[in-house]
Amino acid sequence: MPVVIRLARAGTKKRPVYHVVVADSRYPRDGRFIERLGYFNPLMPKDNADRLKIDLDKVKAWLAKGAQPSDRVARFLDAAGVKKRTARNNPEKAVPRKERKAQAEAAAKS
Protein backbone atom coordinates (compact mmCIF):
# COMPACT_ATOMS: atom_id res chain seq x y z
CA MET A 1 0.00 0.00 0.00
CA PRO A 2 1.83 3.18 -1.19
CA VAL A 3 1.16 5.73 1.54
CA VAL A 4 1.53 9.47 0.94
CA ILE A 5 1.27 12.56 3.11
CA ARG A 6 -0.67 15.09 1.06
CA LEU A 7 -3.23 17.89 1.11
CA ALA A 8 -6.96 17.17 0.90
CA ARG A 9 -9.11 20.14 -0.08
CA ALA A 10 -11.94 21.21 2.21
CA GLY A 11 -13.83 24.43 2.77
CA THR A 12 -16.34 26.09 0.48
CA LYS A 13 -16.31 27.39 -3.05
CA LYS A 14 -13.58 30.04 -3.50
CA ARG A 15 -12.50 29.61 0.15
CA PRO A 16 -10.19 26.59 0.28
CA VAL A 17 -8.80 25.01 3.42
CA TYR A 18 -6.56 21.98 3.14
CA HIS A 19 -6.18 19.11 5.59
CA VAL A 20 -2.75 17.48 5.79
CA VAL A 21 -3.61 13.79 5.65
CA VAL A 22 -1.99 10.39 5.35
CA ALA A 23 -3.70 8.42 2.61
CA ASP A 24 -3.21 5.57 0.21
CA SER A 25 -2.07 7.09 -3.08
CA ARG A 26 -4.90 5.31 -4.90
CA TYR A 27 -7.61 7.08 -2.88
CA PRO A 28 -9.23 10.23 -4.33
CA ARG A 29 -7.68 13.55 -3.34
CA ASP A 30 -10.58 14.53 -1.08
CA GLY A 31 -11.69 10.99 -0.29
CA ARG A 32 -10.74 8.40 2.27
CA PHE A 33 -7.66 8.92 4.41
CA ILE A 34 -5.87 7.04 7.15
CA GLU A 35 -5.09 9.88 9.56
CA ARG A 36 -5.34 13.68 9.67
CA LEU A 37 -2.08 15.36 10.67
CA GLY A 38 -2.94 19.04 10.46
CA TYR A 39 -4.33 21.78 8.25
CA PHE A 40 -3.26 24.59 5.91
CA ASN A 41 -5.27 27.76 5.28
CA PRO A 42 -3.82 29.61 2.26
CA LEU A 43 -6.15 32.59 2.73
CA MET A 44 -4.48 33.66 5.98
CA PRO A 45 -1.49 36.03 5.91
CA LYS A 46 1.87 34.30 5.57
CA ASP A 47 3.10 35.54 8.94
CA ASN A 48 0.05 34.19 10.81
CA ALA A 49 0.86 31.24 13.07
CA ASP A 50 -2.51 29.59 12.35
CA ARG A 51 -1.90 29.42 8.59
CA LEU A 52 -0.25 26.00 8.93
CA LYS A 53 -0.58 23.56 11.81
CA ILE A 54 1.03 20.12 11.58
CA ASP A 55 1.59 17.51 14.28
CA LEU A 56 5.30 17.00 13.61
CA ASP A 57 5.57 13.95 15.89
CA LYS A 58 2.95 12.11 13.85
CA VAL A 59 4.62 13.22 10.61
CA LYS A 60 7.97 11.84 11.77
CA ALA A 61 6.30 8.56 12.72
CA TRP A 62 4.68 8.22 9.28
CA LEU A 63 7.93 9.12 7.52
CA ALA A 64 9.66 6.40 9.54
CA LYS A 65 7.00 3.95 8.33
CA GLY A 66 7.80 4.84 4.72
CA ALA A 67 5.18 7.43 3.82
CA GLN A 68 6.23 9.80 1.04
CA PRO A 69 5.28 13.49 1.26
CA SER A 70 3.78 15.25 -1.75
CA ASP A 71 5.69 18.18 -3.26
CA ARG A 72 3.75 20.82 -1.33
CA VAL A 73 3.92 18.93 1.97
CA ALA A 74 7.65 18.38 1.40
CA ARG A 75 8.02 22.18 1.21
CA PHE A 76 6.19 22.54 4.52
CA LEU A 77 8.35 19.87 6.16
CA ASP A 78 11.52 21.47 4.82
CA ALA A 79 10.46 24.83 6.29
CA ALA A 80 9.74 23.13 9.63
CA GLY A 81 13.13 21.38 9.55
CA VAL A 82 11.68 17.86 9.61
CA LYS A 83 12.84 16.56 6.24
CA LYS A 84 15.23 18.13 3.77
CA ARG A 85 13.67 18.63 0.35
CA THR A 86 15.79 17.61 -2.61
CA ALA A 87 16.25 20.33 -5.18
CA ARG A 88 14.88 19.67 -8.61
CA ASN A 89 17.68 20.18 -11.07
CA ASN A 90 17.48 19.33 -14.75
CA PRO A 91 20.71 20.47 -16.45
CA GLU A 92 19.45 19.16 -19.81
CA LYS A 93 16.46 21.51 -19.79
CA ALA A 94 18.34 24.49 -21.24
CA VAL A 95 20.16 22.45 -23.91
CA PRO A 96 18.65 23.11 -27.34
CA ARG A 97 17.44 20.27 -29.52
CA LYS A 98 19.50 19.06 -32.48
CA GLU A 99 17.41 21.00 -35.01
CA ARG A 100 17.88 24.22 -33.09
CA LYS A 101 21.61 23.60 -32.87
CA ALA A 102 21.77 23.10 -36.62
CA GLN A 103 19.75 26.27 -37.26
CA ALA A 104 21.94 28.24 -34.88
CA GLU A 105 25.10 27.00 -36.61
CA ALA A 106 23.65 27.82 -40.04
CA ALA A 107 22.70 31.30 -38.89
CA ALA A 108 26.17 31.82 -37.44
CA LYS A 109 27.84 30.88 -40.75
CA SER A 110 25.79 33.28 -42.86
UniProtKB/Swiss-Prot annotation:
The gene is rpsP. GO terms for molecular function: structural constituent of ribosome. It comes from Nitrobacter hamburgensis (strain DSM 10229 / NCIMB 13809 / X14). One of its GO terms (biological process) is translation. The keyword Ribosomal protein applies. This is Small ribosomal subunit protein bS16. The keyword Ribonucleoprotein applies. Residues 84-110 are annotated as: Disordered. Residues 90-103 have a biased composition (Basic and acidic residues). It comes from the Bacteria.
